[in-house]
Amino acid sequence: MKQSVSAEQIELKSSLPGSKKVYVDGPREGMKVPMREIEQSDTNGVPNPPIRVYDTSGPYTDPEYKVELEKGLQAPRHSWILERGDVEAYEGREVKPEDDGVKVASKHTPVFPQMDRKPLRAKQGANVTQMHYARNGIITSEMEYVAIREGVEPEFVRKEIAEGRAILPANINHPEAEPMIIGRNFHVKVNANIGNSAVSSSIAEEVEKMTWATRWGADTIMDLSTGKNIHTTREWIIRNAPVPVGTVPIYQALEKVNGIAEDLTWEVYRDTLIEQAEQGVDYFTIHAGVLLRYIPITAKRTTGIVSRGGSIMAQWCLFHHKENFLYTHFEEICEIMKQYDVSFSLGDGLRPGSIADANDEAQFSELETLGELTKIAWKHDVQVMIEGPGHVPMHLIKENMEKELDICQGAPFYTLGPLTTDIAPGYDHITSAIGAAMIGWFGTAMLCYVTPKEHLGLPNKDDVREGVITYKIAAHAADLAKGHKTAHQRDDALSKARFEFRWRDQFNLSLDPERAMEYHDETLPAEGAKTAHFCSMCGPKFCSMRISHDIREYAKENDLETTEAIEKGMKEKAKEFKETGSHLYQ
């Protein structure tokens, strides 16, 4: 008997503290765009308005929603897709045991119950990409939805997609996903990588990681599974994912040939693309820029080729002494992509894996080829983003952004960090967030998170949380630096709450309310401490913000200007400081 994955097997939580799920009505009937509304307490009887923030958590944080993983999420986009009249349902390819990396299907594998659904594809001669619609002046329902999430006009969304500066990854076979956009003129997005390996993790664990990542703010997830049950794991994830799902198809193709890179063929790879497109994968990382002539250049590197996909294709090219079949068949790949609206994430197979290799000839040679491939994809109206490094010291980061915008004609940049130093295993979420904040400021559209386990092991759900929060910090810092019109509102609200000692509001407005309250309560756990005008750092006598309040009160009571009050107030505080023994902490 086939097993299943149930909600009881994984940890699903309701809304974050002090928050509730709200929905904004869209322009068409039934369109409801989710937001997270953070409540605030009053200040001396004066109301502080609730703060609405972008929400990626899907229905899992809606108390009215009953989670049934075996049924998958509701599919609001399904009717939008059918209404356009350019798709057809068909039988699809037969799912085989080889798709899960086995010769005989295991009775213990929890197969998703709805495997008999028919996939959709474009009708003969049709193109169903969001870029195709945008270039023909059509504002789709997906674009209207995105406009509400981003706080912009639908026409602006359409134009950014039409001109290739943004992508809206939305496979017609993933109608469960809530539409989102990736582009430098929108909020900086964060991707979280999940997926099993040959030695670790189960299907239930990966579904849990997906719901966990989106709860903390992941805008997309990539399933990078390389072990058994790749197809089945992906089916469970996609059917329950409220965000776009990306993959690296070469990983599964390699499993189909028993892990022997030289046995890969275009036919096996093509079959894998169609398999994943029928399931609903929204974007593919394709390492079509790893050309035969670039491989020898990497020989003088400190760390060679560090991309898994890049190394697989390099091994194939060298064994056969032929050009990369992903490059030679690129037009055919475009034909597949536009039948399902799968977006390209053109892989950086030659990205630097160490500071010593940053911005070298191999890296930028591949980037030139990615620019060439971008033009070909756009000729087919297929959406494209470009993957970037990697390991890059701070002073070399800006050059990466400038070259990508120039060579790839403004296509969205999607970077892994970059890591700004190589000496901190166990802390690479920090070394990379430094680079991520910088390159996000310079124009990168989406940041691929790095967890504390980078270079060390497969991340668990706690590592996923740490990685997502770290990268939400980097993305938000980049939004602030770019002057995004609404980015500062949450900062301003939290700063006001901090100055007014509204501790619960401080916790609730933060990116990780649970962690903030946990740290506060380690030293001041009493409920009364949630209203105290100090914390354990400075104590009640030397809290700078309490002193500032005292100065303002002094000015008010003595009818003084603030500057004069500060001078007089500071003299009094100096006297008080001396009288208490000149000790800073008490």
Swiss-Prot record:
Substrate binds at N193, M222, Y251, H287, S307, R308, G309, D348, G349, L350, R351, E387, Y414. Pathway: Cofactor biosynthesis; thiamine diphosphate biosynthesis. Zn(2+) binds at H391, H455. It catalyses: 5-amino-1-(5-phospho-beta-D-ribosyl)imidazole + S-adenosyl-L-methionine = 4-amino-2-methyl-5-(phosphooxymethyl)pyrimidine + CO + 5'-deoxyadenosine + formate + L-methionine + 3 H(+). [4Fe-4S] cluster binds at C535, C538, C543. InterPro entries: ThiC, ThiC-associated_dom, ThiC/Bza_core_dom, ThiC/BzaA/B. Binds 1 [4Fe-4S] cluster per subunit. The cluster is coordinated with 3 cysteines and an exchangeable S-adenosyl-L-methionine. GO terms for cellular component: cytosol. Residues 22-39 have a biased composition (Basic and acidic residues). Catalyzes the synthesis of the hydroxymethylpyrimidine phosphate (HMP-P) moiety of thiamine from aminoimidazole ribotide (AIR) in a radical S-adenosyl-L-methionine (SAM)-dependent reaction. This is Phosphomethylpyrimidine synthase. It comes from Bacillus cereus (strain ATCC 10987 / NRS 248). The lineage of its organism: Bacteria, Bacillati, Bacillota, Bacilli, Bacillales.
